């Protein structure tokens, strides 16, 4: 049984990017779809689609590469996890690589990037960092 599905999704994305795969599939859930949509809107992945087939629904995440197949994602880190939740106020949201990366937060208004949370002055649970 998987205890942290978000960490599993982030690990699959990281491993696929390091192996230079075009896409990866993860079991679908609303929170994973929301994280993937934020990664897409911030320019870290090219596309995300929910696919149905035999068995449970899956999210197909299409990775984004630049020149020389350089991945848009250099690193991913799960911050808050089931055994250690991490909460931050809006004025304490960390800047990832001086603003080159993003943090994803779970707030009372749903999942959002660190930039949106700072703009709306909302704190919450710090889900992960991507750079």
UniProtKB/Swiss-Prot annotation:
Q: Which GO terms describe its molecular function?
A: rRNA binding; structural constituent of ribosome
Ribosomal protein keyword on record? yes
User: What Gene3D superfamilies does this protein map onto?
Assistant: 3.30.1370.30, 3.30.1490.10
GO terms under cellular component: ribonucleoprotein complex; ribosome
Q: Which GO terms describe its biological process?
A: translation
Give UniProt keywords alphabetically.
Answer: Ribonucleoprotein, Ribosomal protein, RNA-binding, rRNA-binding
Q: Which domain of life is it from?
A: Bacteria
In the record, the note on similarity to other proteins reads: Belongs to the universal ribosomal protein uS8 family.
User: What HAMAP family does its record include?
Assistant: Ribosomal_uS8_B (MF_01302_B)
> Can you state the subunit structure given in the record?
Part of the 30S ribosomal subunit. Contacts proteins S5 and S12.
Job of this protein? One of the primary rRNA binding proteins, it binds directly to 16S rRNA central domain where it helps coordinate assembly of the platform of the 30S subunit.
* Name of this chain's protein: Small ribosomal subunit protein uS8
Which gene holds the coding sequence for this protein? rpsH
């Amino acid at each position: 049984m998987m205890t942290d599905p978000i960490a599993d999704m982030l690990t699959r994305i990281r491993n696929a990017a390091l192996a230079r795969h075009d896409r990866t599939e993860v079991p679908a859930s609303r929170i994973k779809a929301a994280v993937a949509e934020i990664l897409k809107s911030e320019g870290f992945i090219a596309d995300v689609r929910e696919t149905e087939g035999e068995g449970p629904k899956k999210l197909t995440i299409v990775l984004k590469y630049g020149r020389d197949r350089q991945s848009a994602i250099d690193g991913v880190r799960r911050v808050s996890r089931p055994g250690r939740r991490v909460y931050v106020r809006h004025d304490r949201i960390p800047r990832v690589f001086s603003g080159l990366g993003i943090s994803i937060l779970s707030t009372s208004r749903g999942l959002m990037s660190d930039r949106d949370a700072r703009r709306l002055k909302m704190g919450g649970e710090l889900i992960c960092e991507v750079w």
